[in-house]
Amino acid sequence: MRSILPTRVLLLLLLATSINAWSADGRILNFEGDVRVNGQPVTADTALKKEDTITTAPGASAKIILSDNSVLDLEGGSEILISDYSFNPSAPETNTSKVDILAGTLRYVSGRIAKDDPDNISFTAGNSTIGVRGSFISISVDPKAEKAEK
């Protein structure tokens, strides 16, 4: 009886971890330096969801993979908001990916959503909206310059 209880507890913990991973829209694939999600420090495999804000301190970097296999690379001093994200491979007409680039530099390699319908992908940088018509983009935003223009 004693050996069954620890096994059951371990199975429950594994199941809870797996369910959390399945419900995530993406995750931190790897990172270096001070990287935060909603103000909290990340760890390897930190789960990401719609409406999360990801911030990299100067000199830091992060690689994010979303559930459609698109990849976002953030350089140091960057901040993005996953403003909308939905991926269902069996209903591609409902898929959407919208990212607001608040500061810094983002590199993007497209995944399944862009392949199925590029109109379902957009990036907002300041007053600009960027659509994807290829498989790779790089965007830099300087929020100080944007404020000076207003």
Which ranges hold each PLM region?
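N-terminal signal peptide c-region/cleavage motif recognized by signal peptidases
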Residues: 16-18, 23
